[in-house]
């Protein structure tokens, strides 16, 4: 089969057009209303008097996001968090199992819609487990605080970066307030998440 010069030129032109048009066509698929995302994130609580990276506290969260118009989104997440409270020579375990529902609003983004800065609010409810539901410590002391159901509100900021059109990495800072917790009502934390757009 003989390939003519016109066919080579046509083929080259089509390839060049695809390369030029592909980024804008794919970019148009970002932040589509009703698009959903699945996110896994890890976090660390910020505890007064403890080094951020030398503590045993951590959190894991699984979230489902739903995009609205103009890059806004709502989310529903389920998370587990743990940290240790110091009492004499003991470390009293504190664990939280929380469900969080919230809204995120984009405040800033770059021209190419690759990086976004979000501010959001949330409501949360869950169970706070103190010392594995045991009221007596190993030295015989009795805890005045116990495990309980908790509820609260949160304020969060995030910087989200599109690695590809479907994969987003985000750094987050959250401030949660648990109204009926006897241990720490104010819970600041830092986190890092990876979201896949479905």
Where are the model-predicted features located?
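Short glycine/proline- and aromatic-enriched beta-strand/turn motifs that initiate or cap beta-hairpins
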Residues: 26-78
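Residue-level detector of the transmembrane beta-barrel scaffold of outer-membrane proteins
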Residues: 37-41, 73-77, 116-120, 168-172, ...
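Cleavable N-terminal export/targeting peptides
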Residues: 1-34
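Gram-negative (and chloroplast) outer-membrane scaffold detector with strong preference
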Residues: 63-137, 196-198
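Short loop/turn motifs that connect adjacent beta-strands in outer-membrane beta-barrel proteins
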Residues: 28-35, 69-71, 108-117, 163-167, ...
């Amino acid at each position: 089969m003989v390939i003519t010069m016109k066919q080579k030129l046509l083929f080259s032109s089509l390839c060049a057009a695809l390369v030029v048009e592909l980024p804008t066509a794919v970019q148009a698929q970002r932040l589509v209303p009703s698009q959903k995302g699945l996110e896994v994130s890890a976090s660390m609580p910020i505890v007064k008097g403890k080094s951020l990276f030398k503590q045993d506290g951590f959190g894991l969260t699984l979230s489902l996001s739903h995009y609205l118009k103009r890059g806004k989104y709502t989310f529903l997440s389920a998370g587990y968090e743990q940290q240790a409270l110091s009492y004499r020579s003991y470390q009293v375990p504190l664990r939280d199992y929380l469900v969080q529902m919230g809204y995120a609003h984009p405040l800033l983004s770059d021209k190419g819609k690759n990086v976004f800065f979000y501010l959001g609010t949330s409501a949360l409810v869950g169970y706070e487990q103190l010392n594995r539901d045991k009221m007596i410590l190993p030295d015989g002391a009795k805890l005045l605080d116990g495990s309980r159901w908790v509820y609260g509100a949160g304020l969060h900021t995030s910087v989200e970066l599109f690695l590809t059109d479907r994969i987003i990495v985000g750094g987050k800072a959250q401030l949660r307030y648990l109204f009926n917790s006897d241990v720490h009502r104010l819970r600041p934390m830092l986190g890092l998440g990876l979201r896949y757009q479905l």
